[in-house]
Amino acid sequence: MRNIGFLSFGWWSGAPGSRVRTAGDVLEDTIRLAEAAEDAGMDGAWMRVHHFEQNTSSPFPLLAAMGARTSRVELGTGVINMRYENPLYMAEAAATADLISGGRLQLGVSRGSPESAADGPGTFGYPLPVGTTPAEDSAQRIAQFREAISGAGIAEPGAHAHVREGEKLPIQPHSPGLSDRIWYGAGGNDSARRVGELGMHLMSSTLVLEATGEPLGVVQSRQIDIFRTAWREAGHAGEPRVSVSRSIMPIVDDLTTTYFGPHLERDRMGANRDQIGEIDNAVSTFGKTYVGDLDKLEKELREDEAVMSADTLLVTIPNQLGADFNRITFDAFAELRERLRS
């Protein structure tokens, strides 16, 4: 593991204790989180994308603003449900945000996850075509998006187009290199293998769609190996990157003790462990929360095979506590990265 970033779920609510009470609050605070991560020496600022819920949804205006207020950190999504997207419009928006950031976007995409709306994509104007599965529909949209951001010509020219004979019109603007920075959120071994074959990077979260009774890190490490083997056998150039997400609560002062202390007590009682449950009709392994001082966190994370195998660790953060609180934990995460690198 050599990079560490945060993953904000982007929630807002008027609940007692929330520092992020409105949609406007969460947008401004997410920008401040990116600035705080950069100031602390972290490597990435990533955001969750969900629709029809009180959290961040349309990512590209926010990513552009984060890019304008930072200069170094990677800016990512975890993940964009492609069934909601017009791939060509998304290609324009993504390239625009990437150019504003100076080429720092890392875009995680997927076929989506369980959500609030009965048929969200259909409501957005993208009903599932007859005879097509959600996975197939998503795969087609991803392929079209990747072609569009590659700079390839995709539209037939009209009478007033300024192109050579036989050429097609590409999406504009084009951001060179963006097509090499597309990730896929894979839940199981088959999808991890397919991601490697297609030449996208792998995102693996705090759960996997497999339940063997083994720790999440062991199951996930096997998924990472499958992905890297598939990438290599497909002959792709460049480095196959992998991120894993974890819930990590560093206790470093009185304030973090106040918020995270109850989780530490559960940990001491043995109630904090990986669990097996069901999501989207699939039996899955859910990861535990890592909580404690830096020595304890370092020891336990070193024992997590997936964390040590991945190049990037994304820490899910309590974004509703606000950027000022999370800035305290960001210093701890940056130190953890240095410890785990050695």
State where each predicted segment sits.
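Flexible, glycine-rich active-site loops centered on histidine and acidic residues
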Residues: M1-A23, Y84-I154, E210
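Glycine-rich, proline-tolerant flexible connector loops at the mouths of alpha/beta enzymes
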Residues: G44-M66, N81, T206-G217, T316-F325
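Active-site mouth loops of central-metabolism enzymes
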Residues: G10-E28, I80-L88, P176-A186, S284-D295
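Hydrophobic faces of well-ordered beta-strands that scaffold small-molecule active sites
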Residues: I4-S8, A45-M47, L75-G78, L105-V109, ...
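A conserved active-site cap/scaffold subdomain adjacent to cofactor or substrate pockets
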Residues: G188-A211, P215-L216
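N-terminal beta1-alpha1-beta2 module of alpha/beta enzyme domains
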Residues: M1-V73
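An alpha-helical appendage that flanks or caps ligand/catalytic pockets
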Residues: L128-I171, S204, T212-A310
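Conserved, mostly hydrophobic/aromatic
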Residues: I4, G41, V49, M66, ...
